[in-house]
């Protein structure tokens, strides 16, 4: 409650200039030059403005939808390699949003929903592809980890919390959320594996697949606007998930063996098999590209769930050369990001070619793919980023192979053009 009488006319009863209610009939009366407005009229004005904005918002749909070629070009700016996956994703995403813009069935033909399944090793770019597409289309995007999801009634995260997160990303604007993209990672971890005694999830993950089924296919999810139990009497928001694009991703370790068994590819499985080298890695990628729905069923996904993910794209494992490109070529490449950080201190950061190769080699040996690059670069530059704000006159820092291998610190170049190797001494 505000103090309504301290408006310069302490003995006079004040009224809202819009609705005529007195200061005693409203919670707050705001004074202006010879005019007063109550909190109820302010709220009414806000409602009117919100409604007008909502009426204008659908007109955005008339904006030109990027073609598959344009989507692919945008992906090329941020993601290295994975050409086949980019093409599959670009077409699927284009068709999805074309379907939303032409929701009225033509000649009785109703377009089905094309959710996407991405199969590829850790650090190959699955999450980045989904995130980059959402950014290029300017639609809300959220991520979920399938391993944290449970059926209703189990301890864990309810599948409808995914929609809650999407709503949060667009300030609970339902219309915006219904044009969004949801990426569910580690989807292979909820596969049904009855032959694995270590599985402790409910019904070996099948229950979670069943819970996700309706959400992915399309249902009207009732979501509390502020997150559930804290406000039990609030009205629920109704979100139509049939308009949301779901992209599921997973490494699917061992899936190539399932495919080989079906296709009778004699690549050598068992104790007598040869140790896999670079050639075998290419063979694994080629084998995964031949995946069929029946292989995914045998792997542990239920047929109904696979049916809701009709578009399948496989990603190849990144080699050392690709990791070097990832470090320097994309618009938001790691080296460019750290260079921007150093520029804020007035320092130029240079990564020499041998340093990039050494970083890529280290990431390959850790088997983390592109995902492990940031932690490696962060470790290399930690001491330098700690010291530089306190050192006067540094204009350039140089990172070479010896720095990556821990044999020396980055070379610091000062204004007087003396090149000094930063010693570890205090």
UniProtKB/Swiss-Prot annotation:
Positions that bind Zn(2+): 16, 19, 38, 41
Domain ClpX-type ZB intervals: 4-57
Summary of the function given for this chain in its UniProt record: ATP-dependent specificity component of the Clp protease. It directs the protease to specific substrates. Can perform chaperone functions in the absence of ClpP.
InterPro entries xref list: AAA+_ATPase, ATP-dep_Clp_protease_ClpX, ATPase_AAA_core, Clp_ATPase_C, Clp_protease_ATP-bd_su_ClpX, ClpX_bact, P-loop_NTPase, Znf_CppX_C4
One Gene Ontology cellular component: HslUV protease complex
GO MF, one annotated term: unfolded protein binding
Keyword Zinc: yes
Family, per entry: Belongs to the ClpX chaperone family.
Subunit and interaction comment: Component of the ClpX-ClpP complex. Forms a hexameric ring that, in the presence of ATP, binds to fourteen ClpP subunits assembled into a disk-like structure with a central cavity, resembling the structure of eukaryotic proteasomes.
Domain of life (superkingdom): Bacteria
Lineage summary: Bacteria, Pseudomonadati, Pseudomonadota, Gammaproteobacteria, Alteromonadales
Protein name: ATP-dependent Clp protease ATP-binding subunit ClpX
One Pfam family hit: ClpB_D2-small
Source organism: Shewanella sp. (strain MR-4)
Alphabetical keyword list: ATP-binding, Chaperone, Metal-binding, Nucleotide-binding, Zinc
Binding residue positions for ATP: 121-128
BP-aspect Gene Ontology terms: cell division; proteolysis involved in protein catabolic process
């Amino acid at each position: 409650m505000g103090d309504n009488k301290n408006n310069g006319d302490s003995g006079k009863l004040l009224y809202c200039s819009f609705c005529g209610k007195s200061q005693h009939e409203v919670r707050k009366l705001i004074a202006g030059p010879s005019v007063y407005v109550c909190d109820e009229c302010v709220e009414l004005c806000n409602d009117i403005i919100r409604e007008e904005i909502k009426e204008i918002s659908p007109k955005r749909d008339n904006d030109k939808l990027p073609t598959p070629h344009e989507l692919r070009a945008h992906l090329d700016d941020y993601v290295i390699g994975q050409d086949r996956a980019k093409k599959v994703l670009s077409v699927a995403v284009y068709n999805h949003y074309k379907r939303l813009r032409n929701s009225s069935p033509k000649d009785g033909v109703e377009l089905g929903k094309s959710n996407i399944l991405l199969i590829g090793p850790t650090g190959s770019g699955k999450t980045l592809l989904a995130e980059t597409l959402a950014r290029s289309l300017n639609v809300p995007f959220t991520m979920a980890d399938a391993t944290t999801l449970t059926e209703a009634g189990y301890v864990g995260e309810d599948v409808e919390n995914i929609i809650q997160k999407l709503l949060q990303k667009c300030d609970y604007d339902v219309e915006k959320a219904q044009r969004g993209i949801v990426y569910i990672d580690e989807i292979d971890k909820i596969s049904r594996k009855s032959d694995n005694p270590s599985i402790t999830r409910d019904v070996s993950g099948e229950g979670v697949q069943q819970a996700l089924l309706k959400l992915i296919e399309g249902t009207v999810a009732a979501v509390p606007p502020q997150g559930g139990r804290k406000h039990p009497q609030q009205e629920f928001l109704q979100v139509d998930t049939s308009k949301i694009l779901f992209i599921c991703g997973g490494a699917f370790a061992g899936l190539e063996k399932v495919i080989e068994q079906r296709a009778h590819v004699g690549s050598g499985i068992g104790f007598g098999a040869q140790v896999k080298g670079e050639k075998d890695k290419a063979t694994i990628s080629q084998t995964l590209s031949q995946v069929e729905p029946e292989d995914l069923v045998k792997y542990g996904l239920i047929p109904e769930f696979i049916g809701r993910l009709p578009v399948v794209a496989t990603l190849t494992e990144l080699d050392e050369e690709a990791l070097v490109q990832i470090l320097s070529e994309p618009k938001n490449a790691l080296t460019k990001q750290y260079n921007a950080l150093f520029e804020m201190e007035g320092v130029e950061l240079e990564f020499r070619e041998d340093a990039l190769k050494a970083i890529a080699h280290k990431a390959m040996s850790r088997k983390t793919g592109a995902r492990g690059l940031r932690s490696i670069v962060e470790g290399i530059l930690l001491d330098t980023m700690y010291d530089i704000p306190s050192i006067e006159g540094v204009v350039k820092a140089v990172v070479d192979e010896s720095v990556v291998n821990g044999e020396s610190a980055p070379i610091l170049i000062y204004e007087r053009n003396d090149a000094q190797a930063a010693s570890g001494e205090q």
